[in-house]
Amino acid sequence: MIYQDYDIIPLKENYDGSVLEPKHFLPLIPLVLLNGVSGIAVGWSTEILPRSMSDLIEATLAAIDNKKKFPDILPNYEYLGCNVRGIGDNAYEFVGKVVVDGSSIIVHELPPDLSLEKFKDRLNKMEDEEQIQTYVDRSTKDIKIEVRFKRGSINGWTESKAIEFLKLRSKKTERIVVLDWDGNNIKQYESVEKLVRDFVEWRVSFYAVRYKKLIADATYQLNWNQALKLCYDKGLPAFLPKAKNRAEIITKIKEITAKIVIDEPQQDRLAALPSYRWAQDAYNDVLSNIAELSSTIKDYQAILDDPDKMRAIYRQEVSALKKLHNVER
């Protein structure tokens, strides 16, 4: 459900012009913030930290609703449970988790830039320098390292003191540099909020593209049904047995439908209809189709003419994504 509107995705030629490929996709939320990215190019660098799907959905809904108070979208590493807080200017502090237990410190989480192997190297050095007595690594899926000290040497230590001693605090500064949503230019954002708000305004503009296409597709079908009705009304069923060949049938269809816009495939489709399709009950089906398509086009046009309705539909689809995500968690 993250990706919508596959039939209106802008296309471009591939490197040799042999096929068309997507210029970009149309996700409901700004996926550039989901997994994070780090990179360097000539004159530019980017460092985008990952976020949770839930937070991105909530931020997108807030932007759709034009809320002045925007939710915090703190970095989130799904494989870590460390504490995170913003410290201003797109900088964040990550803090590991520990428990002080008698003469031991139990480490339950590391900051994102500190791997288990690097931390164990650090502990080995601290053990060599007699800063700690020893340590036991009981980590499996989750981090669990018991760092042992001499009896009484850490009496009164707080978790904060233990974190500082073991250097389980790190900082990262985000630099949000991305290709714009159409994939044409490099753009730098001063904040995650600005990026999300900008994305939402870009994404909602494609709802107009969606409904223009829906109207065009429905109109194409309506024209064919109206042409079929005219063929009934203008005596094409009676003409068919007299026609010498298919070319005469096509010529007759063109005469009857001269004032209706249909293309050659639609003309061929009319000419190829089996005889039972010219019965009275089939004619009634055509009348029903015309009425239904006309009503559908009217509904689509009402949505296209009202930006608030298109925004509301966008909101409904993001809300449905939120519901699905909550079920799958």
Give the ranges of each region predicted by the language model.
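Conserved mixed alpha/beta core segments that line enzyme active sites in large multi-domain catalysts
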Residues: 2-30
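C-terminal interaction appendages of subunits in large macromolecular complexes
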Residues: 4-5, 24, 31, 35-329
